[in-house]
Structure formats: C-alpha cells, structure tokens
Amino acid sequence: MKLGIVGAGLIVNTLLEFIHEVDIELIAISATPAEKDKLLDLQNKHGFKYVYTDYDEMLQNNEVDTVYLGVNNHLHFTFALKALQANKHIILEKPFTSNYNQALKLVNLAKEKHLMIFEAISTIHNPNFKKIEELLPSLGDVKIVTLNYTQYSSRYDAFKKGEILPAFDYKKSGGALMDLNIYNIHFIIGLFGSPKSVDYIANIKENIDTSGILTMDYGTFKAVLIAAKDCGAPYTNCIQADEGCIYTSSPMFTLTHFEHQLNKQDPIHYDLTNNAHRMKHEFLDFLEIFNKKDYAADEKIMEHSLAVMKVITEARSKIDLVFPDDQNI
C-alpha cells in the first residue's frame, strides 16, 4: 500500500504515531496552503516523498494508490468522491459521511470501479471486540445492552463562550452522535447487525447535539447508547443476557479490556490489545485485505459502514438535525 494522506491535524498526527510499525509506504501528504509549515515539518519527521497544498494535484500522483482522509466530517463525501474518480482506494476517517445517501453513492462507485473503501474506526478491528464476538453465544439470550461514552470535551468551554470548533459545528457535520456515539453504534451493529427501529433524544445547543441518548430495538432485546460532549462520568458498558454478561469500564473508542461473567461464576478478565496503538489493528486488517485483494472482505466492511450510516441518518431525523452537507449528493 502506497499512501497519500490528506490533513495535518490531530487525527493525522495520531496516525503517524504508529504508521511506521506497519508495512505501508508514505508517499505524499496534502493540506491547505495555510498548513504548509505543518506539512513540511511532517515531511521532515516522517519521510514523505511529496508535499501538496492542492488535493487535486496529489490525486494525479500515480505513485499513490490509496488515500487516507483525515479531514473534517463535512468534507468526507466530496474528498472521497474525488479519490474514487481518480481511481484511488480510500481509508476514510469515521464517520464515513454526513448521511446514508452519500455513503451509498461512494460504496456503489467503489464497487463499480473495483476500488476499496475502509472506514477508519478502531472498535470493530480491536482484538477485544473479536473476542467478545466469539464469546457472545455463551451468554444465552441477550436482553439489554447499555453503552455509555460520555467525555467532557476539551472544546466545550470554548463552545460555551461562543467559539464553535468543528466538533460542535453543525455546518461541519459535528455533534455527539457523529463524534462519540458512532463508536457505540459500530460496536453494536458489529455484533448484532441492524436494529428493527431506532429513536434519538438529545440536548441541543447552537443547532447541534451536545449529548444524546440513542435507543435501538432489536425485537428480542433493547439497547441504549449514550454519548455526551457536555458532561462526563465513568464509562459503563454492558451486554446483559439470561446466562451471563460482558462488561467493561473502557469506552468503545479504545476497548482496552473487558470482563466475561457467566451466571454464578467468577468473571474472566480479557485484555488482548498487547498495548498496541488503538489504531494499529484496524490498519493491519486493512493492509491484509488490500494485499490479498480480498474484495469480498472489503465489501463486508463497506456494508457494515452503510448500516451504521443508516442508523445515524435515521437518528438525526428524530431530532430534525440537518447538516448543510446533506444537500451535497
């Protein structure tokens, strides 16, 4: 895989913390002209062959076969569409797009052009998640799932003072659902598939959900997914069933450990990440699929992302949360 990276912000710097540990060649990096100094610094530190302040120019570089998009949410669809049109595979930061219709258009085009799209979401590639998936049948009939990712945002104080940064900006497809609850949604859909119905209630300020509660009805069991950027509390996550439970005090963002406990038995502790960077496992999965040209595996990943975006889009409709980017299709 020969990677071209788009962006020079926090998530790109997080990616670069571990990317040299996997067999990916860093070819190019692109951002805005205002970020030129950052780009040159990253080139010096990480050995990029090319630096661009024009995304379209980077897409013309034939040495780049895959583009990683670490840009604001509202730019995901436009940037991904251009990459596909330039015959590039894509690693697209979560959330996949602003809405389901955008996601569907990207997936259909990728299939048509025989290209791969990977959503960069750590949760479902985490070894602990895969172990939970393996242990799930031992619990019997699932009855209740509760997931809670509440984290007082470092940007919320500024937000209260009127400074609206991307994570709280509806114009940039931000909010608690898109930024935090998406990890919970990926977790539950990864284990159980799509629900029969969803509902969403939220605390709204400046046209954005600063916190909210998403309910998902699976018929035989119910799930409550909580996310908040305007308050914080200890993380509590539990799958409750008639023969046992699986629980963790780790958010789905990192899922560093969990406990598996059957009725009348002591809990068994699991921590299978080997202290690896939280994003490393997903990129190892992407690389394996890419190198094997396993389009069936990638299609499964894309279908999973579509299911997540369908839930998010329906949840937003429950609170009339509209993004300007919704018109971009």
Residue ranges: model-predicted function:
Residues 126-195:
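Predominantly a Rossmann-like dinucleotide-binding segment in NAD(P)-dependent oxidoreductases
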Residues 1-46:
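N-terminal Rossmann-like dinucleotide-binding module
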Residues 184-254, 284-292:
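Contiguous beta-strand/loop segments that form the cofactor/metal-binding neighborhood of enzyme cores
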Residues 66-68, 285-329:
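C-terminal helix-rich "cap/oligomerization" subdomain common to oxidoreductases
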Residues 52, 92-93, 117-119, 248:
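Hydrophobic residues in well-ordered beta-strands that form the structural core
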